[in-house]
Regions:
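Secretory targeting and sorting signals
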Residues: 2-24
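C-terminal PAP-associated
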Residues: 25-447
Protein backbone atom coordinates (compact mmCIF):
# COMPACT_ATOMS: atom_id res chain seq x y z
CA UNK A 1 0.00 0.00 0.00
CA UNK A 2 1.30 3.47 -0.82
CA UNK A 3 -0.44 5.25 2.03
CA UNK A 4 0.01 4.98 5.79
CA UNK A 5 -1.38 1.70 7.13
CA UNK A 6 -1.94 0.56 10.69
CA UNK A 7 -2.47 -2.97 11.94
CA UNK A 8 -5.30 -4.57 13.80
CA UNK A 9 -7.05 -7.81 14.97
CA UNK A 10 -8.05 -10.87 17.36
CA UNK A 11 -9.06 -12.57 20.57
CA UNK A 12 -7.65 -13.78 23.89
CA UNK A 13 -4.81 -16.24 24.24
CA UNK A 14 -6.87 -19.22 25.24
CA UNK A 15 -5.88 -22.42 23.52
CA UNK A 16 -9.35 -23.08 22.16
CA UNK A 17 -12.42 -20.91 21.68
CA UNK A 18 -15.75 -22.39 20.65
CA UNK A 19 -18.01 -20.17 18.59
CA UNK A 20 -21.81 -19.99 18.58
CA UNK A 21 -23.32 -22.01 20.08
CA UNK A 22 -20.94 -22.21 23.03
CA UNK A 23 -21.52 -25.93 23.62
CA UNK A 24 -20.66 -27.01 20.07
CA UNK A 25 -17.42 -28.82 19.33
CA UNK A 26 -15.12 -27.53 16.63
CA UNK A 27 -12.13 -29.14 14.93
CA UNK A 28 -9.21 -30.29 17.07
CA UNK A 29 -6.13 -28.09 16.68
CA UNK A 30 -2.51 -29.11 17.30
CA UNK A 31 1.10 -28.43 16.25
CA UNK A 32 0.86 -24.64 16.45
CA UNK A 33 3.99 -22.81 15.28
CA UNK A 34 5.31 -19.40 14.29
CA UNK A 35 8.60 -18.27 12.77
CA UNK A 36 10.17 -15.02 11.63
CA UNK A 37 11.20 -15.33 7.98
CA UNK A 38 12.62 -11.89 7.01
CA UNK A 39 15.65 -10.34 8.70
CA UNK A 40 17.05 -7.42 6.68
CA UNK A 41 16.87 -4.32 8.90
CA UNK A 42 17.56 -2.06 5.93
CA UNK A 43 13.91 -2.60 4.99
CA UNK A 44 10.51 -2.70 6.64
CA UNK A 45 9.28 -6.09 5.43
CA UNK A 46 5.55 -6.64 5.65
CA UNK A 47 2.20 -6.79 3.83
CA UNK A 48 2.62 -10.52 3.15
CA UNK A 49 0.59 -13.08 1.20
CA UNK A 50 0.90 -16.87 1.11
CA UNK A 51 -0.05 -19.76 -1.19
CA UNK A 52 0.58 -23.52 -1.15
CA UNK A 53 1.01 -25.56 -4.32
CA UNK A 54 -1.77 -28.21 -4.42
CA UNK A 55 0.42 -30.41 -6.62
CA UNK A 56 3.29 -30.23 -4.10
CA UNK A 57 2.29 -29.07 -0.58
CA UNK A 58 5.96 -28.61 0.32
CA UNK A 59 6.16 -25.84 -2.28
CA UNK A 60 5.02 -22.62 -0.62
CA UNK A 61 5.32 -19.04 -1.89
CA UNK A 62 5.26 -16.12 0.51
CA UNK A 63 5.27 -12.60 -0.97
CA UNK A 64 5.99 -9.40 0.94
CA UNK A 65 7.13 -5.80 0.47
CA UNK A 66 10.69 -4.59 0.94
CA UNK A 67 9.86 -1.06 2.05
CA UNK A 68 12.78 1.35 1.56
CA UNK A 69 10.87 4.49 2.55
CA UNK A 70 13.56 6.70 0.98
CA UNK A 71 16.06 5.20 3.39
CA UNK A 72 14.21 6.26 6.56
CA UNK A 73 13.57 2.70 7.76
CA UNK A 74 17.19 1.63 7.43
CA UNK A 75 18.65 4.83 8.90
CA UNK A 76 16.29 4.58 11.85
CA UNK A 77 17.80 1.19 12.70
CA UNK A 78 21.42 1.83 11.84
CA UNK A 79 21.35 0.55 8.26
CA UNK A 80 21.54 3.48 5.82
CA UNK A 81 20.73 2.63 2.19
CA UNK A 82 23.91 1.56 0.46
CA UNK A 83 22.96 -0.84 -2.32
CA UNK A 84 21.77 -0.13 -5.83
CA UNK A 85 18.23 -1.29 -5.17
CA UNK A 86 17.75 1.35 -2.46
CA UNK A 87 18.39 4.07 -5.03
CA UNK A 88 16.38 2.47 -7.83
CA UNK A 89 13.34 1.45 -5.76
CA UNK A 90 13.46 4.36 -3.35
CA UNK A 91 10.02 3.74 -1.88
CA UNK A 92 9.06 0.06 -2.16
CA UNK A 93 9.99 -3.23 -3.79
CA UNK A 94 8.30 -6.63 -3.98
CA UNK A 95 10.02 -9.84 -2.90
CA UNK A 96 9.14 -13.49 -2.44
CA UNK A 97 10.28 -16.38 -0.30
CA UNK A 98 9.93 -19.84 -1.84
CA UNK A 99 10.36 -23.23 -0.23
CA UNK A 100 10.22 -26.78 -1.55
CA UNK A 101 10.61 -28.52 1.81
CA UNK A 102 7.60 -27.19 3.70
CA UNK A 103 9.36 -24.16 5.17
CA UNK A 104 12.58 -25.71 6.47
CA UNK A 105 14.57 -23.64 3.99
CA UNK A 106 13.50 -20.50 2.15
CA UNK A 107 15.01 -18.72 -0.83
CA UNK A 108 14.46 -14.98 -1.18
CA UNK A 109 14.33 -13.21 -4.52
CA UNK A 110 12.88 -10.09 -6.11
CA UNK A 111 9.56 -10.41 -7.94
CA UNK A 112 9.64 -9.15 -11.55
CA UNK A 113 6.51 -7.03 -11.25
CA UNK A 114 8.50 -3.79 -11.35
CA UNK A 115 12.13 -2.69 -11.29
CA UNK A 116 14.38 0.07 -12.57
CA UNK A 117 15.66 -2.28 -15.26
CA UNK A 118 12.14 -3.13 -16.44
CA UNK A 119 10.97 0.50 -16.57
CA UNK A 120 12.94 3.31 -14.90
CA UNK A 121 9.91 5.61 -15.04
CA UNK A 122 7.94 3.36 -12.64
CA UNK A 123 10.42 1.24 -10.67
CA UNK A 124 8.56 0.86 -7.36
CA UNK A 125 6.39 -2.14 -6.50
CA UNK A 126 3.65 -2.69 -3.90
CA UNK A 127 0.45 -4.52 -2.96
CA UNK A 128 1.45 -8.07 -3.95
CA UNK A 129 -0.84 -11.09 -3.54
CA UNK A 130 -0.18 -14.71 -4.53
CA UNK A 131 -2.28 -17.79 -5.28
CA UNK A 132 -1.93 -21.20 -6.93
CA UNK A 133 -4.39 -22.84 -9.30
CA UNK A 134 -5.19 -26.56 -9.24
CA UNK A 135 -2.52 -27.27 -11.87
CA UNK A 136 0.23 -25.78 -9.73
CA UNK A 137 0.54 -22.52 -11.66
CA UNK A 138 1.28 -19.57 -9.37
CA UNK A 139 -0.07 -16.06 -9.94
CA UNK A 140 1.16 -12.83 -8.36
CA UNK A 141 -0.55 -9.49 -8.72
CA UNK A 142 1.21 -6.28 -7.75
CA UNK A 143 1.56 -2.61 -8.55
CA UNK A 144 4.32 -0.83 -10.40
CA UNK A 145 4.43 2.91 -9.88
CA UNK A 146 6.38 6.10 -9.51
CA UNK A 147 5.84 8.38 -6.53
CA UNK A 148 4.09 10.80 -6.44
CA UNK A 149 3.14 10.76 -10.13
CA UNK A 150 1.18 7.49 -9.75
CA UNK A 151 -1.66 9.80 -8.68
CA UNK A 152 -1.84 11.15 -12.24
CA UNK A 153 -1.51 7.83 -14.04
CA UNK A 154 2.10 6.64 -13.73
CA UNK A 155 1.26 3.32 -12.12
CA UNK A 156 -0.98 0.29 -12.56
CA UNK A 157 -1.50 -3.29 -11.42
CA UNK A 158 0.17 -6.16 -13.24
CA UNK A 159 0.08 -9.95 -13.09
CA UNK A 160 2.90 -12.48 -13.45
CA UNK A 161 2.75 -16.29 -13.62
CA UNK A 162 5.12 -19.06 -12.57
CA UNK A 163 5.08 -22.64 -13.85
CA UNK A 164 7.93 -23.88 -11.64
CA UNK A 165 6.79 -23.11 -8.11
CA UNK A 166 7.98 -19.50 -8.02
CA UNK A 167 11.53 -19.96 -9.30
CA UNK A 168 10.90 -18.02 -12.52
CA UNK A 169 8.09 -15.76 -13.71
CA UNK A 170 6.55 -14.57 -16.96
CA UNK A 171 6.58 -11.00 -18.15
CA UNK A 172 3.80 -8.96 -16.51
CA UNK A 173 0.44 -8.18 -18.09
CA UNK A 174 -1.37 -4.90 -17.36
CA UNK A 175 -4.68 -5.45 -15.57
CA UNK A 176 -6.45 -2.07 -15.78
CA UNK A 177 -4.35 0.49 -17.66
CA UNK A 178 -4.09 4.01 -16.28
CA UNK A 179 -3.44 7.12 -18.34
CA UNK A 180 0.32 6.53 -18.75
CA UNK A 181 0.18 2.72 -18.95
CA UNK A 182 0.71 0.42 -21.92
CA UNK A 183 -2.74 -0.15 -23.40
CA UNK A 184 -4.07 3.23 -22.32
CA UNK A 185 -7.10 4.18 -24.43
CA UNK A 186 -8.58 7.58 -23.47
CA UNK A 187 -10.69 7.56 -26.63
CA UNK A 188 -12.50 4.38 -25.67
CA UNK A 189 -12.75 5.54 -22.04
CA UNK A 190 -14.02 8.97 -23.16
CA UNK A 191 -11.75 10.42 -20.52
CA UNK A 192 -8.92 9.42 -18.23
CA UNK A 193 -8.06 6.74 -15.69
CA UNK A 194 -5.43 7.36 -13.03
CA UNK A 195 -4.34 6.53 -9.47
CA UNK A 196 -4.41 2.73 -9.05
CA UNK A 197 -4.28 1.48 -5.46
CA UNK A 198 -5.08 -1.50 -3.17
CA UNK A 199 -6.32 -4.47 -5.13
CA UNK A 200 -7.48 -8.00 -4.33
CA UNK A 201 -7.43 -11.10 -6.52
CA UNK A 202 -9.54 -14.25 -6.81
CA UNK A 203 -9.46 -17.32 -9.04
CA UNK A 204 -12.54 -19.21 -10.18
CA UNK A 205 -11.12 -22.73 -10.25
CA UNK A 206 -14.13 -23.99 -12.22
CA UNK A 207 -13.87 -21.56 -15.15
CA UNK A 208 -10.19 -20.63 -14.82
CA UNK A 209 -11.06 -16.92 -14.79
CA UNK A 210 -8.95 -14.53 -12.72
CA UNK A 211 -10.58 -11.50 -11.12
CA UNK A 212 -9.05 -8.35 -9.65
CA UNK A 213 -10.91 -5.58 -7.89
CA UNK A 214 -9.12 -2.39 -6.99
CA UNK A 215 -9.25 1.35 -6.56
CA UNK A 216 -8.85 3.66 -9.53
CA UNK A 217 -9.40 7.35 -10.10
CA UNK A 218 -11.51 8.04 -13.15
CA UNK A 219 -12.73 11.05 -15.07
CA UNK A 220 -14.44 9.16 -17.85
CA UNK A 221 -17.81 8.21 -19.31
CA UNK A 222 -18.33 5.27 -16.96
CA UNK A 223 -17.34 6.90 -13.67
CA UNK A 224 -16.16 10.06 -11.97
CA UNK A 225 -13.91 10.19 -8.92
CA UNK A 226 -12.27 7.48 -6.85
CA UNK A 227 -14.03 4.23 -7.76
CA UNK A 228 -13.78 0.47 -7.39
CA UNK A 229 -13.37 -1.62 -10.52
CA UNK A 230 -13.61 -5.29 -11.47
CA UNK A 231 -11.20 -6.66 -14.08
CA UNK A 232 -11.30 -10.16 -15.57
CA UNK A 233 -8.81 -12.36 -17.38
CA UNK A 234 -10.23 -15.35 -19.23
CA UNK A 235 -6.87 -16.70 -20.41
CA UNK A 236 -4.83 -17.19 -17.25
CA UNK A 237 -3.74 -13.59 -16.83
CA UNK A 238 -2.26 -13.13 -20.29
CA UNK A 239 -4.82 -10.49 -21.27
CA UNK A 240 -7.54 -8.58 -19.43
CA UNK A 241 -10.96 -7.30 -20.39
CA UNK A 242 -12.13 -3.77 -19.74
CA UNK A 243 -12.28 -3.11 -16.00
CA UNK A 244 -15.88 -2.20 -15.23
CA UNK A 245 -16.69 0.48 -12.65
CA UNK A 246 -18.78 -0.95 -9.80
CA UNK A 247 -19.18 1.85 -7.26
CA UNK A 248 -17.46 3.73 -4.46
CA UNK A 249 -13.85 2.74 -3.80
CA UNK A 250 -13.74 0.15 -1.03
CA UNK A 251 -11.62 -2.72 -2.31
CA UNK A 252 -11.88 -5.84 -0.16
CA UNK A 253 -11.21 -9.58 -0.54
CA UNK A 254 -13.44 -11.00 -3.28
CA UNK A 255 -14.46 -14.59 -4.00
CA UNK A 256 -15.19 -16.64 -7.12
CA UNK A 257 -16.42 -20.16 -7.90
CA UNK A 258 -18.70 -21.95 -10.37
CA UNK A 259 -18.94 -18.95 -12.70
CA UNK A 260 -19.88 -16.40 -10.02
CA UNK A 261 -17.66 -13.65 -8.59
CA UNK A 262 -18.85 -11.77 -5.50
CA UNK A 263 -17.63 -9.00 -3.19
CA UNK A 264 -19.03 -6.32 -0.92
CA UNK A 265 -19.38 -2.60 -1.55
CA UNK A 266 -20.80 0.43 0.28
CA UNK A 267 -24.44 1.16 -0.45
CA UNK A 268 -24.82 3.82 -3.18
CA UNK A 269 -25.30 7.35 -1.87
CA UNK A 270 -28.24 7.87 -4.24
CA UNK A 271 -30.32 4.89 -3.16
CA UNK A 272 -30.07 1.19 -3.77
CA UNK A 273 -29.25 0.44 -0.15
CA UNK A 274 -32.52 -1.35 0.51
CA UNK A 275 -34.24 -0.95 3.86
CA UNK A 276 -30.92 -0.47 5.66
CA UNK A 277 -29.07 2.56 4.32
CA UNK A 278 -26.06 1.87 6.58
CA UNK A 279 -25.70 -1.74 5.43
CA UNK A 280 -23.33 -3.09 2.82
CA UNK A 281 -24.22 -4.15 -0.70
CA UNK A 282 -23.04 -7.27 -2.47
CA UNK A 283 -21.75 -6.93 -6.04
CA UNK A 284 -22.11 -10.05 -8.19
CA UNK A 285 -21.14 -10.99 -11.74
CA UNK A 286 -22.31 -14.18 -13.43
CA UNK A 287 -21.02 -13.40 -16.93
CA UNK A 288 -17.28 -13.36 -16.40
CA UNK A 289 -17.03 -9.79 -15.15
CA UNK A 290 -18.66 -8.19 -18.17
CA UNK A 291 -21.47 -6.77 -16.05
CA UNK A 292 -22.47 -6.74 -12.38
CA UNK A 293 -25.60 -6.78 -10.28
CA UNK A 294 -25.88 -5.14 -6.89
CA UNK A 295 -27.88 -6.64 -4.01
CA UNK A 296 -28.65 -4.77 -0.77
CA UNK A 297 -28.22 -6.63 2.52
CA UNK A 298 -29.14 -6.11 6.16
CA UNK A 299 -25.49 -6.55 7.23
CA UNK A 300 -24.29 -3.33 8.92
CA UNK A 301 -21.16 -1.70 7.58
CA UNK A 302 -19.63 -0.78 4.25
CA UNK A 303 -17.39 -3.77 3.56
CA UNK A 304 -16.67 -7.36 4.58
CA UNK A 305 -14.31 -10.03 3.28
CA UNK A 306 -15.88 -12.74 1.10
CA UNK A 307 -15.03 -16.39 0.41
CA UNK A 308 -16.58 -19.00 -1.91
CA UNK A 309 -17.56 -22.55 -0.99
CA UNK A 310 -15.84 -24.51 -3.78
CA UNK A 311 -18.21 -27.47 -3.37
CA UNK A 312 -21.52 -25.76 -4.14
CA UNK A 313 -22.52 -23.21 -6.77
CA UNK A 314 -23.83 -19.96 -5.32
CA UNK A 315 -22.58 -20.64 -1.78
CA UNK A 316 -20.50 -17.84 -0.26
CA UNK A 317 -19.68 -16.48 3.19
CA UNK A 318 -19.00 -12.97 4.47
CA UNK A 319 -17.16 -12.11 7.68
CA UNK A 320 -18.37 -8.77 9.03
CA UNK A 321 -17.59 -7.01 12.30
CA UNK A 322 -20.50 -6.18 14.60
CA UNK A 323 -20.86 -3.33 17.11
CA UNK A 324 -19.28 -5.47 19.84
CA UNK A 325 -16.20 -6.13 17.72
CA UNK A 326 -16.98 -9.79 17.03
CA UNK A 327 -16.53 -11.45 13.65
CA UNK A 328 -19.97 -12.47 12.40
CA UNK A 329 -20.36 -15.06 9.65
CA UNK A 330 -23.12 -14.62 7.05
CA UNK A 331 -23.88 -17.20 4.35
CA UNK A 332 -25.74 -17.20 1.05
CA UNK A 333 -26.83 -20.22 -0.99
CA UNK A 334 -28.34 -18.26 -3.89
CA UNK A 335 -25.39 -16.29 -5.22
CA UNK A 336 -25.68 -13.29 -2.91
CA UNK A 337 -29.37 -12.46 -3.14
CA UNK A 338 -30.17 -13.46 0.45
CA UNK A 339 -27.95 -13.83 3.52
CA UNK A 340 -28.29 -15.64 6.84
CA UNK A 341 -26.26 -15.09 9.99
CA UNK A 342 -24.81 -18.50 10.88
CA UNK A 343 -21.92 -18.02 13.32
CA UNK A 344 -19.87 -15.67 15.41
CA UNK A 345 -16.31 -15.46 16.74
CA UNK A 346 -15.92 -13.29 19.82
CA UNK A 347 -12.79 -11.18 20.03
CA UNK A 348 -12.86 -9.91 23.64
CA UNK A 349 -10.75 -6.86 24.41
CA UNK A 350 -9.34 -6.60 20.90
CA UNK A 351 -10.27 -5.20 17.52
CA UNK A 352 -10.25 -7.67 14.57
CA UNK A 353 -8.75 -6.40 11.33
CA UNK A 354 -6.70 -7.46 8.32
CA UNK A 355 -9.04 -10.43 8.06
CA UNK A 356 -8.27 -13.10 5.46
CA UNK A 357 -10.49 -16.02 4.43
CA UNK A 358 -10.12 -19.37 2.70
CA UNK A 359 -12.44 -22.32 2.03
CA UNK A 360 -10.87 -25.63 1.04
CA UNK A 361 -12.25 -28.17 -1.43
CA UNK A 362 -12.58 -30.51 1.56
CA UNK A 363 -15.12 -28.09 3.05
CA UNK A 364 -12.99 -26.47 5.76
CA UNK A 365 -13.75 -22.77 6.25
CA UNK A 366 -10.83 -20.77 7.63
CA UNK A 367 -10.16 -17.23 8.81
CA UNK A 368 -7.11 -15.39 10.10
CA UNK A 369 -6.87 -11.95 11.64
CA UNK A 370 -4.79 -9.63 13.76
CA UNK A 371 -6.23 -8.51 17.09
CA UNK A 372 -5.24 -5.08 18.33
CA UNK A 373 -5.29 -4.02 21.97
CA UNK A 374 -6.29 -0.46 22.93
CA UNK A 375 -2.57 0.43 23.21
CA UNK A 376 -1.94 -0.62 19.58
CA UNK A 377 -0.16 -3.92 20.27
CA UNK A 378 -1.55 -6.98 18.50
CA UNK A 379 -1.31 -10.72 17.94
CA UNK A 380 -2.38 -13.11 15.20
CA UNK A 381 -5.14 -15.73 15.40
CA UNK A 382 -6.58 -18.36 13.09
CA UNK A 383 -9.86 -20.29 13.19
CA UNK A 384 -11.37 -23.21 11.27
CA UNK A 385 -14.88 -24.59 10.89
CA UNK A 386 -16.09 -27.98 9.66
CA UNK A 387 -19.78 -26.94 9.44
CA UNK A 388 -19.81 -23.94 7.08
CA UNK A 389 -19.23 -21.30 9.73
CA UNK A 390 -21.64 -22.35 12.46
CA UNK A 391 -18.91 -23.38 14.90
CA UNK A 392 -15.20 -22.56 14.97
CA UNK A 393 -12.11 -23.65 16.81
CA UNK A 394 -9.87 -20.64 17.37
CA UNK A 395 -6.17 -20.66 18.10
CA UNK A 396 -3.65 -17.97 18.78
CA UNK A 397 -0.69 -18.42 16.41
CA UNK A 398 1.66 -15.60 17.44
CA UNK A 399 3.36 -16.40 20.74
CA UNK A 400 3.41 -12.83 22.03
CA UNK A 401 1.97 -9.51 20.94
CA UNK A 402 3.70 -7.28 18.45
CA UNK A 403 4.19 -3.75 19.77
CA UNK A 404 2.64 -0.94 17.81
CA UNK A 405 4.82 0.89 15.35
CA UNK A 406 6.39 3.94 16.98
CA UNK A 407 8.95 4.93 14.35
CA UNK A 408 8.96 6.59 10.97
CA UNK A 409 6.24 5.07 8.82
CA UNK A 410 5.26 5.65 5.20
CA UNK A 411 3.42 2.59 3.88
CA UNK A 412 3.49 -1.15 3.32
CA UNK A 413 1.48 -3.19 5.83
CA UNK A 414 -2.04 -3.59 4.43
CA UNK A 415 -2.55 -7.33 4.65
CA UNK A 416 -2.22 -10.52 6.61
CA UNK A 417 -3.17 -13.80 4.92
CA UNK A 418 -3.98 -17.48 5.38
CA UNK A 419 -4.05 -20.58 3.15
CA UNK A 420 -5.75 -23.91 3.88
CA UNK A 421 -4.60 -27.37 2.87
CA UNK A 422 -6.59 -30.51 3.68
CA UNK A 423 -5.34 -30.53 7.28
CA UNK A 424 -3.36 -27.32 7.90
CA UNK A 425 -3.90 -23.60 8.21
CA UNK A 426 -0.87 -21.54 7.20
CA UNK A 427 -0.74 -17.84 8.04
CA UNK A 428 1.52 -14.85 7.48
CA UNK A 429 1.53 -11.36 8.97
CA UNK A 430 3.74 -8.33 9.62
CA UNK A 431 5.20 -7.95 13.11
CA UNK A 432 7.19 -5.25 14.97
CA UNK A 433 8.70 -7.40 17.73
CA UNK A 434 12.24 -6.66 16.57
CA UNK A 435 11.45 -2.89 16.40
CA UNK A 436 11.45 -3.14 12.59
CA UNK A 437 8.51 -4.47 10.57
CA UNK A 438 9.25 -8.10 9.69
CA UNK A 439 7.25 -10.90 8.11
CA UNK A 440 6.31 -13.94 10.17
CA UNK A 441 4.62 -17.14 9.17
CA UNK A 442 2.92 -19.79 11.27
CA UNK A 443 -0.06 -22.07 11.48
CA UNK A 444 -1.51 -25.25 12.92
CA UNK A 445 -2.83 -28.70 12.08
CA UNK A 446 -6.55 -29.47 12.41
CA UNK A 447 -8.66 -32.61 12.35
Amino acid sequence: MRRTALLAVPVFAASLLLAHPATAQGPRISHVFEQQVTFDDAYAEGEPSIAVNPRNPNNIILTFLANVGYGFYGVEHGHPPTNTRDREQAMQGCDELITFDGGKHWKRQQLPVASFQMDPTRPNCSDTLVLFDDKGVAYVVGSNFQFPTFATGQGDFRLIRSYDGGRTWTKPSVISPALLSPGSDPGAWQGARFYDDREFMALDRDTGYLYVNGTQGRAAADAQGNIEYLATSRDGGRTWGNAVAVGTASAVQLAAAHGIVLFTSPAPATGGGGECTDCLNVVVSTDGGRSVKRYPTTIPGSSASAVADPRHKGHFALFAKDSAGALVVHRTVDGGKHWTKVGRIDVPGRSPAKVWLDWSREGVLGVGWRGTMPDGSYGFWGAVSFDDGKHFSVKRISKVDSPKNTGVWVAGDDTSAIWLTHDRLYATWGDWRSSVLKTYWGGFTFR
